[in-house]
C-alpha cells in the first residue's frame, strides 16, 4: 500500500488495550513486524456510524473496507460479515485501477476483471455499442 502512496487506517470499536493484545498475541505470530498502519479505536461507534457499519444495539462494527480518494470521496467500499475475510489483492487491484483512472483524468477506464498492464477502455460515444470489440467476458475472470 505504501508503494502506491496509500494511507491505511484500521478502525474498530475495540479499545487501544484490546488492539495491543491482538497485536502482541495474534498478529505478531502472523507477521514478523508490527502492523504497518495505525489501529484506531472508535469506542462508541461514531466513525462506524458515519460509514454505516456500526451496530448500535450490539455495540459492534461490521468489517468494512473503504477506498477514499485524495479529495475525500469514497470511490469503493466492501462490507463483509465476520465469517468471511476480505481479499488484499483485490483491494490493491482496485486502488491501482482508481489511480489509473485519476491519472488519466477519466480518459481511460478499467473494464471488469482488469489487472495492471491489461487493456483499458477509452470512454466516449465511439465505445457505445462497441465494447464487445474491445473487451471479452473471459477477461473478467482470472486465468
Predicted features and spans:
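Chalcogenol-based redox active-site neighborhoods
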Residues: 1-143
Amino acid at each position: 500500500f505504501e508503494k502506491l502512496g496509500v494511507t491505511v487506517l484500521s478502525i474498530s470499536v475495540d479499545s487501544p488495550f484490546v488492539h495491543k493484545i491482538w497485536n502482541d498475541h495474534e498478529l505478531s505470530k502472523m507477521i514478523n513486524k508490527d502492523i504497518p498502519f495505525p489501529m484506531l479505536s472508535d469506542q462508541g461507534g461514531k466513525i462506524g456510524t458515519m460509514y454505516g457499519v456500526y451496530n448500535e444495539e450490539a455495540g459492534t462494527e461490521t468489517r468494512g473496507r473503504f477506498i477514499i480518494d485524495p479529495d475525500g470521496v469514497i470511490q469503493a467500499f466492501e462490507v463483509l460479515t465476520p465469517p468471511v475475510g476480505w481479499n488484499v489483492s483485490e483491494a490493491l487491484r482496485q486502488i491501482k485501477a482508481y489511480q489509473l483512472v485519476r491519472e488519466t483524468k477519466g480518459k481511460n477506464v478499467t473494464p471488469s476483471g482488469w489487472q495492471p498492464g491489461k487493456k483499458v477502455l477509452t470512454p466516449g460515444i465511439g465505445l457505445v455499442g462497441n465494447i464487445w470489440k474491445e473487451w471479452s467476458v473471459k477477461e473478467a475472470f482470472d486465468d
